[in-house]
Amino acid sequence: MATGKGAAASTQEGKSQPFKVTPGPFDPATWLEWSRQWQGTEGNGHAAASGIPGLDALAGVKIAPAQLGDIQQRYMKDFSALWQAMAEGKAEATGPLHDRRFAGDAWRTNLPYRFAAAFYLLNARALTELADAVEADAKTRQRIRFAISQWVDAMSPANFLATNPEAQRLLIESGGESLRAGVRNMMEDLTRGKISQTDESAFEVGRNVAVTEGAVVFENEYFQLLQYKPLTDKVHARPLLMVPPCINKYYILDLQPESSLVRHVVEQGHTVFLVSWRNPDASMAGSTWDDYIEHAAIRAIEVARDISGQDKINVLGFCVGGTIVSTALAVLAARGEHPAASVTLLTTLLDFADTGILDVFVDEGHVQLREATLGGGAGAPCALLRGLELANTFSFLRPNDLVWNYVVDNYLKGNTPVPFDLLFWNGDATNLPGPWYCWYLRHTYLQNELKVPGKLTVCGVPVDLASIDVPTYIYGSREDHIVPWTAAYASTALLANKLRFVLGASGHIAGVINPPAKNKRSHWTNDALPESPQQWLAGAIEHHGSWWPDWTAWLAGQAGAKRAAPANYGNARYRAIEPAPGRYVKAKA
């Protein structure tokens, strides 16, 4: 043990080093130490504030010696080969850089940068293999993998001016103008509080997005109800009520005429009503899950039935909108009411046993923190979950695509983002009431109680999803990272009546918004519903193109005979208030 001046000097030297000497990089203790030291430095508060997990989960985890040895041996072999190739100037020894971040000629033809990219990819592979090899429960392993991937993605040489040859070339060719423009872009984004992903000035809700013709026929403090103008002379008797997620603006379902699911359904001869959620302000900070069920979902069903003159209507829920719809119908069933002729659930979770990547954000400590700061716990005032925080969290689920890609293009290269309607919608964030959010976190993501008959009481009655005894169409997207398709399939075990499950290609949004005219992607069908989703897929038939025609054919069978299309919006009780898309969707977070 060091004593006297030596000990003091050693202590002082240790304090002056931002990252102390630790065991080798193949020891999980190293990762834990890096994480703790990083969390102790200035400017690191974002991770804790946003709920992004750190690496404290690494405490006590191990890697099997044989597996660790294999990773070490493979790493050292490839590292030595790269080092020798660099010393000899053999660029071809790196092999092709199979990563779009390094696809440009500047990376391929400039040896120092080519080797920098190759060493980075080698280290990234090794760290990922180590994260996958830890001996821990599934949730801990997923958190470690997520934290490692965040660090690895952030440290790409493409993200820094000093190690990005494309940005350096632009800097020289533009005489410094690219850097000047990049700094200007960064300062504007700092003012806005988010990274620009598109040229938002190119879009306006109601002018060139969300343009399907219609009117607001009802509104309260939670939502506006839109009714769309018929595009056919005759329409099915039963209307369709669409309930989008309240964590986003509704117009993902009505971006452009050629990609609008709303317009497509109207063109098939359906009267369409749609919930346009209010963007909560301080006056709604205390709103609860029960409020959204009673005063939004159930109220929308009542108004759509009244205007259409139908005892039963078809109902569609998208993402958390599907969770809200299912809860509302179960509440109504407990009251002896059955207003739905059919239900459509798009990328919806009812069984929250597998919540995909979002599971890394949810544990008892995090939920308690949210309840104390947002949900009115311990006598504290209720507050809003700001849409900007939610949007940033979702962006970091795909950091290379939605964060670092724009850091490089906008800041290092000084480019202006191109107009893109989907990214305009993605950046149009909405707030959430704290109590609503906390209830949703605890009772679904954390405790998975919605699937248990009678476990939850909502609006004063016990909830039993099996009481939703109507034909149900369930859709999942195969590459969905928010609602894994196998989790969407799990709803088939909870609902009671004639069920149809269809699987689409692509992800959470692109899989859903897949108009037939583009003839893109594919979908899978299987009339059987075995217990295992893997068994379902093994017996499924793949069909080229959109799943929309399959769904609209099914929906037509639930919608009743056709009659003359209504000449006016609403009825004597519910008159048109203003043209679609209405005021609520235009409110900014």
Swiss-Prot record:
Has keyword Transmembrane?
no
**Is Transferase tagged as a keyword?**
yes
GO terms for CC?
cytoplasm
State the pathway, as annotated in the record: Biopolymer metabolism; poly-(R)-3-hydroxybutanoate biosynthesis
Query: Region entry Disordered: which residue ranges?
Result: 1-23
**What InterPro entries does this protein's entry cite?**
AB_hydrolase_fold, PHA/PHB_synthase, PHA_synth_I, PhaC_N
Q: What is its main location?
A: cytoplasm
Subunit info? Monomer.
Q: What is this protein called?
A: Poly(3-hydroxyalkanoate) polymerase subunit PhaC
Q: List the gene name.
A: phaC
